[in-house]
């Protein structure tokens, strides 16, 4: 298995190079809140672009929508979130810390399985627990200006419900057959009582969710198709290390209240093997619930078989921050090179925040190298320019932030109009004429995945 470092290694690395840092740091921070810096914001955007290109772009049976964070509060009643979206928590009476029951014992799938006599507090080692209590994870807020007219609403805990409530409109808009998918990117919010483990569990996060509407008899076929698609995306597009990923199918007694079948793609994060991407057969639960509460029909008419039915839903759901974190863990390595520690981020070329960097060998060549940088900046590639420091230190920085190719503009370049290209992973160097650079990079672009 590839080496997985401690969480602190990744936190410090990402902060050092401006990928991710503590949010509100000027005011001593806010727990479990993170800002994406210049490199992190670009990498996050490239992950979203890769998701869009693979799952949505040019797919005749997939639609992309964008719905609000605040929805009619009745939606959360219909979906079951008001009643069921809770964590079972206990307090250690000795040290006053609060824990999720399922985090104290991973064998526990429901609060009814909790046996306090068998578990000691991980902080103070005492065995002095409070009663189990359920805490709802929905963030509450109000809309309205006048106090007497204010209305209680919730920040969405998932993007899925915004898709379900638009099913009929999308169906009528396109008159499309089943199955078809609807995708959405967007922020979601969960009032996690015990968030933590860096980007893995935060209160505000971005999701990519798809809802595949299908005939209930075809849901297994759709499920298996999406399972294969997720695996392809993780291993071929993001190029995650397969040794760090495991698929886990839930037993019947582990399933969420809405699910008929669930498979999680688990990833070896620093704190353990945890969920990266969930795939669930939600059955007909969602549309039936919204039909019941809205009192409006959400059925589908199958003209070929002359029958009406409520479609089943198959849902792939992933958090962008978790994908980001997994990509860093899978790609980041520390190794010895020429007696020094080399940090390298082995990202696929299409994901690199900075794909190519232009490096003048010395300051005297800076102006001419700048002309080359400006020419390459007219292409679709993400180009950087670095002139400060020795060429060796600039190579090290480029490796650390994942830059795939470094172009060195030296004194010979003035004479032969060629430059040296150094490849990040193999460290091989090749001399390429400047006039052929665009063609050379086009040949080495992995965008065709």
Curated annotation (Swiss-Prot):
Q: Which organism is it from?
A: Mycoplasma pneumoniae (strain ATCC 29342 / M129 / Subtype 1) (Mycoplasmoides pneumoniae)
Example of a GO MF term: protein dimerization activity
Taxonomic lineage from the root? Bacteria, Bacillati, Mycoplasmatota, Mycoplasmoidales, Mycoplasmoidaceae
Q: Which UniProt keywords apply?
A: Aminoacyl-tRNA synthetase, ATP-binding, Cytoplasm, Ligase, Nucleotide-binding, Protein biosynthesis
Where on the tree of life does the source sit, at the highest rank?
Bacteria
Entry-linked PANTHER family: DNA POLYMERASE SUBUNIT GAMMA-2, MITOCHONDRIAL (PTHR10745:SF8), GLYCYL-TRNA SYNTHETASE/DNA POLYMERASE SUBUNIT GAMMA-2 (PTHR10745)
**BP GO annotations:** glycyl-tRNA aminoacylation
Database matches in Pfam families? HGTP_anticodon, tRNA-synt_2b
Keyword check for Zinc, yes or no: no
Task: Please state where this protein is localized.
Answer: Cytoplasm
Assembly, in brief, is:
Homodimer.
Residues noted as binding ATP in the record, renumbered to the chain:
190-192, 200-205, 275-276, 319-322
Q: What does this protein do?
A: Catalyzes the attachment of glycine to tRNA(Gly).
Looking at the keywords, is Nucleotide-binding present? yes
Region forming the signal peptide: none
Residues annotated as binding substrate are: 100, 158, 205-209, 315-319
EC numbers: 6.1.1.14
HAMAP family linked = Gly_tRNA_synth_B
Q: What class of enzyme is it?
A: ligase
Q: Please give the name of this protein.
A: Glycine--tRNA ligase
Q: Which SUPFAM superfamilies match?
A: Class II aaRS ABD-related, Class II aaRS and biotin synthetases
């Amino acid at each position: 298995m590839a080496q997985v470092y401690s969480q602190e290694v990744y936190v410090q690395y990402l902060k050092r190079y401006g990928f991710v840092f503590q949010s509100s740091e000027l005011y001593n921070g806010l727990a479990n809140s993170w800002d994406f810096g210049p490199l992190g914001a670009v990498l996050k955007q490239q992950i979203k672009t890769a998701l869009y290109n693979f799952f949505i772009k040019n797919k005749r049976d997939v639609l992309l929508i964008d719905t609000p964070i605040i929805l009619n509060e009745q939606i959360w009643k219909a979906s079951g979130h008001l009643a069921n979206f809770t964590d079972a928590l206990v307090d250690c009476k000795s040290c006053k810390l609060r824990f999720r029951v399922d985090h104290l014992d991973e064998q526990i799938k429901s609060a009814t399985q909790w046996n306090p006599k068998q578990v000691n507090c991980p902080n103070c080692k005492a065995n002095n627990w409070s009663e189990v209590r359920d805490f709802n994870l929905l963030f509450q807020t109000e809309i309205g200006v006048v106090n007497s007219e204010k209305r209680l609403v919730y920040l969405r805990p998932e993007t899925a419900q915004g898709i379900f409530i638009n099913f009929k409109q999308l169906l009528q808009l396109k008159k499309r057959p089943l199955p078809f998918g609807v995708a959405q990117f967007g922020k979601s919010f969960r009032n996690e009582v015990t968030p933590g483990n860096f980007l893995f569990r935060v209160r505000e996060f971005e999701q990519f969710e798809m809802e595949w509407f299908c005939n209930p008899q075809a849901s297994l076929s759709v499920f298996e198709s999406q399972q294969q698609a997720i695996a392809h995306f993780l291993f071929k597009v993001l190029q995650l290390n397969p040794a760090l990923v495991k698929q886990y199918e839930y037993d019947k007694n582990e399933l969420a209240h809405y699910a008929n079948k669930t498979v999680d793609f688990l990833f070896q994060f620093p704190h353990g093997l945890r969920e990266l991407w969930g795939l669930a057969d939600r059955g007909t639960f969602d549309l039936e619930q919204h039909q019941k509460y809205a009192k409006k029909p959400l059925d589908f008419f199958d003209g070929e078989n002359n029958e009406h039915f409520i479609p089943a839903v198959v849902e792939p759901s992933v958090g962008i921050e978790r994908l980001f974190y997994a990509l860093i863990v899978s790609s980041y390595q520390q190794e010895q090179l020429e007696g020094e520690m080399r940090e390298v981020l082995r990202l696929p070329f299409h994901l690199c925040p900075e794909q190519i960097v232009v490096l003048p060998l010395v300051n005297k060549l800076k102006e001419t190298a700048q002309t080359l940088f400006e020419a390459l900046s007219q292409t679709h590639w993400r180009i950087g320019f670095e002139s400060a420091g020795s060429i060796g230190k600039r190579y090290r920085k480029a490796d650390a932030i994942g830059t795939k190719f470094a172009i060195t503009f030296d004194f010979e370049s003035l004479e032969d109009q060629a430059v040296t290209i150094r490849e990040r992973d193999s460290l091989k160097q090749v001399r390429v004429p400047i006039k052929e650079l665009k063609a050379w990079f086009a040949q080495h672009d992995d965008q065709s995945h």
